[in-house]
């Protein structure tokens, strides 16, 4: 696995990967190879590795990135303590057969004097964007830069970050990026907790409390499966479960359109039940799709 720390190095690595011998092309020995891209902030777990495996299955070569992006953290958030386990992460990526990994420093991605931002208006202020002002502007900016630098054919993201996915899909469409955003299902621990790099912040008791998020979503999912289509009643079912853990502070509990993130009052098509809550000092998010999987979330 090739490790690149500069933009020039990763571009050279991708160029070599794209034009290397391609056994998938019948009757030819050389030709353009497809590139799958998995951008991460590191502290990798099985959720990230599921994205790598999906990319490996669909693309000729896979590139990953590890970059803790400062512009998507607020002033009182966990940028300083976000887990940084680069060597362990690289070992996992190499084991999974990743071809190259981009490991830039902040100065490489945001050189002195940089003043350009990318923001998806309206969407960037919904769900997580409402409680974390500037978060999705930071996400869209760094991902746009990574797409421009790597130039992948497909980029892989997890459904757990559904609001991020909605922002990035709109950005890709509006700015005419020539790539496909692929969304992979949430990977959960055996007890139902959605995998997250931030789970390592939780104490044993907080981890137990955090299970209320997935329980609330399952209650909403069960209500929908039983025929309930009133968004307010579905929310009430979820809120009732969340109340079982009074120490958990709910940021939001919503039923929304998965593409626009607008609240859905009457569920007549695909919808997303989504929750964010603070367990101790740790903010957790989770979601579940209601009804048929929308096109935006299909593999």
Curated annotation (Swiss-Prot):
Subcellular location: Cytoplasm
Main location group: cytoplasm
Subunit note: Homodimer.
Catalytic activity: (R)-pantoate + beta-alanine + ATP = (R)-pantothenate + AMP + diphosphate + H(+)
Enzyme Commission no: 6.3.2.1
A GO BP annotation: pantothenate biosynthetic process
Note: The reaction proceeds by a bi uni uni bi ping pong mechanism.
EC primary class: ligase
UniProt KW keywords: ATP-binding, Cytoplasm, Ligase, Nucleotide-binding, Pantothenate biosynthesis
Chain positions recorded as ATP binding sites: 41-48, 158-161, 187, 195-198
CDD domains (UniProt xref): PanC (cd00560)
Gene: panC
Task performed by this protein: Catalyzes the condensation of pantoate with beta-alanine in an ATP-dependent reaction via a pantoyl-adenylate intermediate.
Pathway linked to the protein: Cofactor biosynthesis; (R)-pantothenate biosynthesis; (R)-pantothenate from (R)-pantoate and beta-alanine: step 1/1
Amino acids binding (R)-pantoate: 72, 164
Binding site for beta-alanine: 72
GO cellular component term, pick one: cytosol
Listed GO MF terms: ATP binding; pantoate-beta-alanine ligase activity
InterPro entries: Cyt_trans-like, Pantoate_ligase, Pantoate_ligase_C, Rossmann-like_a/b/a_fold
Protein name: Pantothenate synthetase
Family to which the UniProt record says this protein belongs: Belongs to the pantothenate synthetase family.
């Amino acid at each position: 696995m090739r490790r690149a720390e500069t933009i020039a190095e990763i571009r050279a690595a991708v160029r070599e990967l794209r034009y290397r011998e391609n056994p998938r092309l019948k009757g030819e020995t050389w030709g353009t190879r497809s590139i799958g891209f998995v951008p991460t902030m590191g502290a990798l777990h099985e959720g990230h590795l599921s994205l790598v495996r999906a990319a490996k299955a669909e693309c000729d070569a896979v590139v990953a990135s590890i970059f803790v992006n400062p512009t998507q953290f607020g002033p009182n958030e966990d940028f300083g303590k976000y887990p940084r386990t680069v060597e362990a992460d690289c070992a996992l990526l190499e084991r999974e057969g990743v071809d190259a990994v981009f490991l830039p420093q902040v100065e490489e991605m945001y050189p002195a004097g940089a003043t350009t931002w990318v923001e998806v208006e309206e969407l960037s202020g919904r769900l997580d964007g409402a409680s974390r002002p500037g978060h999705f502007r930071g996400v869209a900016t760094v991902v746009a830069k990574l797409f421009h630098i790597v130039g992948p054919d497909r980029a892989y993201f997890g459904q757990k970050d559904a609001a991020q996915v909605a922002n990035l899909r709109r950005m890709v469409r509006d700015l005419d990026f020539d790539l496909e955003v692929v969304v992979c299902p949430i990977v959960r621990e055996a007890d139902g907790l959605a995998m997250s790099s931030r789970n390592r912040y939780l104490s044993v008791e907080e981890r137990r409390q955090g299970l209320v998020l997935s329980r609330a979503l399952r209650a909403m999912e069960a209500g929908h499966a039983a025929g309930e289509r009133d968004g307010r009643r579905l929310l009430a079912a979820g809120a009732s479960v969340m109340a079982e853990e009074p120490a958990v502070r709910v940021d939001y509990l919503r039923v929304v359109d998965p593409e626009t993130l607008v609240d859905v009052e009457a569920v007549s098509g695909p919808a997303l039940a989504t929750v964010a809550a603070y367990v101790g000092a740790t903010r957790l998010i989770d979601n579940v799709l209601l009804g048929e999987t929308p096109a935006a979330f299909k593999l």
